[in-house]
Regions:
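Extended, structured, electrostatic nucleic-acid-contact surfaces
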Residues: 64-73
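Extracellular beta-strand-rich solenoid/capping regions of secreted or surface-exposed proteins
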Residues: 136-140
Length: 385
């Protein structure tokens, strides 16, 4: 009978060990390390995120119960203090750089719904206890961090992530996050609507779509009434008043009626070629990033941290993103028709099971569990027990 690795071990085969070792060597990550190497820490953190463990005790206990199944991963008995020290001492840049390396090597052949690549940019704030995470203090009684994120709108995969203090403004965070490419479309909410910021995108021959702020002073150059569509007006405008110098070029303003809310929405863009309804539809795509934030918070538990150190928090976040990438890689290679949550659920329930991962993901799960009818003797024994 052929030897079969556990599901967790098969997931870890997606990790390029040689590439990971290069990152470890760069930052001397395993220097004077005897108990928990950088790779073993990644293994433990992947287990943590997949099992949604939120305490050191829960992780150590869970791994201890499965130790016989994980011996081939070179995981020995781990103490809480060992795991806590590792999160403080291993350099978080190892996991950050490996995330981008893994991202580059993923096969992401994707049909683009709108032709152009859609990049969605936003941030999410993760609140923390100010007494425990004083390095993340940003208000009198609050602490927290922000994840400034750019995702691919068609795959919902994060391509750039910057972790900052929660007090950092979204535009300052995105300037560290985003690399603009000619012809691609960048979608923002109104929090990023700033003349100077948008003009930097224009100068790099990329496109943006955002919402018009109500206090912006603009002047209509030409106006077109659109009939027979949900888009009401398609106007060419320019920035008026003292701010004109911050964005001297013409802009396009699409006025759209949103039936579900009954609201009139105004979309601002520098793309003059796409149909007005397509502009509105692309902006609707912005919800993909909200779904991504919800997914990683709900399923990979990045709202509860095992370490109070800044380094430990970053390690946990980057390991959760690596786990998210691996789940997407498995989906794209093995079971494109299966929902990402279904893949996650099956893998988490069988992490220590020695079964082929493809068999696990393609096996038909019965809706009902057959129950054997007990014999008369069994019923009598139960009655008199």
């Amino acid at each position: 009978m052929a030897y079969q690795r556990t599901i967790l071990a098969q997931m870890l085969k997606e990790i390029n060990r040689h590439d990971f070792k290069i990152k470890v060597s760069k930052y001397a990550g395993d220097h004077k390390t005897h108990k928990l190497s950088c790779f073993n820490l990644l293994t433990v953190m992947m287990y943590t995120h997949l099992k949604s463990s939120i305490t050191l005790r829960g992780i150590v206990t869970g791994l201890g119960l499965m130790l016989s199944s994980f011996y081939h991963l070179n995981l020995k008995s781990i103490k809480r203090s060992t795991l806590s020290d590792a999160l403080k001492q291993r350099d978080s840049r190892i996991y950050e750089e490996y995330y981008y390396s893994l991202l580059r090597n993923m096969n992401r052949t994707q049909r683009r719904k709108f032709g152009n690549k859609i990049n969605i940019i936003d941030s999410t704030t993760i609140s923390m206890c100010v007494e425990k995470f004083n390095w993340a203090h940003y208000k009198t009684t609050k602490a927290g961090i922000k994840l400034h994120t750019q995702i691919d709108g068609d795959t919902r995969i994060p391509e750039h992530v910057t972790i900052t203090n929660a007090k950092v403004h979204d535009i300052n965070g995105v300037n560290k996050t985003t690399q603009y490419r000619k012809g691609e479309i960048y979608v923002y909410d109104r929090g990023y609507a700033c003349y100077k910021f948008l003009y930097t995108i224009e100068l790099q021959e990329a496109f943006f779509i955002t919402r018009l702020k109500s206090n912006w002073k603009t002047r209509v150059l030409t106006s077109h009434v659109l009939e027979g569509t949900k888009a009401l007006f398609d106007d060419i405008i320019e920035v008026d008043g003292l701010k004109h110098g911050e964005y001297p070029n013409p802009l396009r303003l699409v006025t759209f009626y949103h039936e579900e809310s009954g609201k009139i929405l105004k979309f601002l863009t520098n793309n003059f070629e796409m149909p007005a309804e397509t502009i509105a539809e692309i902006y609707k795509y912005r919800w993909q990033i909200e779904l991504f934030f919800k997914w990683i918070k709900q399923h990979l538990k990045i709202v509860s941290f095992l370490s109070t150190s800044k380094n430990g928090v970053k390690i946990q976040i980057w390991c959760s993103l690596i786990t998210y990438l691996l789940l997407n890689s498995i989906k794209s290679r093995l079971v494109k028709t299966l929902d990402l949550f279904d893949i996650y659920r099956r893998l988490t329930l069988a992490l220590d099971k020695k079964i082929d991962i493809l068999e696990l993901l393609t096996h038909k799960i019965e809706a009902t569990i057959p129950i054997q009818k007990p014999s008369d003797i069994g019923q009598m024994e139960l009655f008199y027990a």
